Swiss-Prot record:
Residues 60-80 are annotated as: Disordered. It comes from Streptococcus pneumoniae serotype 4 (strain ATCC BAA-334 / TIGR4). PANTHER family: MEMBRANE PROTEIN INSERTION EFFICIENCY FACTOR-RELATED. This is Putative membrane protein insertion efficiency factor. Belongs to the UPF0161 family. It is a peripheral membrane protein. SMART domains: Haemolytic (SM01234).
């Protein structure tokens, strides 16, 4: 199941992302965050990844935002 959820992210990383300049505001890119969240939390990791993508905009804070050990849709402040 996790491999099926990760496959579209890997497709994005391999074929779509290289076409655009890097724009992620966080350390651990949003696509890598999504993969780690899925590996750690299963389907809930998809929700965490989508929440992370919504947080990645020009007006957000930058820095480390690692995948938390427990499910959360909020930014992980442990990394700072």
């Amino acid at each position: 199941m996790k491999r099926i959820l990760i496959a579209p992210v890997r497709f994005y990383q391999r074929f779509i992302s290289p076409v655009f300049p890097p724009s992620c505001r966080f350390e651990l890119t949003c696509s890598n965050y999504m993969i780690q969240a899925i590996e750690k939390h299963g389907f809930k990791g998809v929700l965490m990844g989508l929440a992370r993508i919504l947080r990645c905009h020009p007006w957000s804070k930058t820095g480390k935002d690692p995948v938390p050990d427990r499910f959360s849709l909020k930014r992980n402040q442990e990394g700072e």
